Amino acid sequence: ENTDFKALDISDHGMVRSWAKEILGKFDVPDYLINNAAVINKNAPLWKVPFKEFSELIDINVKGTYNTIKSFLPEMIKYKKGTIVNFSSGWGRTTSPQVAPYCSSKWAIEGLSKSLSQELPDSMISVALSPGVIDTDMLRSCNLNADSYEKPESWAKRAAPYILNIKQTDNGESLTIS
């Protein structure tokens, strides 16, 4: 089977690079590189968010995406194939009080994805993808009536075909699963 799952700290470039070498040694170059790891800050005005919490959020949400792309992309470019899907958020296109660090990290993902799309060979794709509003622990931490939104399991059934149907004309776009 052409799947592999492993828990790792994506903020650790060395760990991500070792994992990528392991994957590339076992399988062909990936058709899809999906970057979905993220954390959210505890609700607070920006000036009250502890430096360590802000830094760790950026390390995971932004640098983790970069680490994964940097570790896989050279091989993908060598074969001029692959779609890179970087999970963003509605808050990567708008803002909300109490979650400025999270919003800023998702705005970074939007910019990173668009810039990357301009650097890739014509046969490759990079998009920022907002999953829409889903009932998750992350949303629940914001006290936003998360239980009134779609459950992750039903969302995944719609998301998989959506992602598999991302086309070359979508390159550089900010997409949303609605």
Predicted regions and their residues:
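The beta1-alpha1 cofactor-binding region of Rossmann-like NAD(H)/NADP(H)-dependent oxidoreductases
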Residues: 7-18, 51
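Conserved NAD(P)H cofactor-binding loop of Rossmann-fold oxidoreductase domains
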Residues: 36-42
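Substrate-binding pocket helix/loop in short-chain dehydrogenase/reductase
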Residues: 44-46, 53-55
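Active-site-adjacent segment of SDR/Rossmann-fold oxidoreductases
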Residues: 94, 115-124
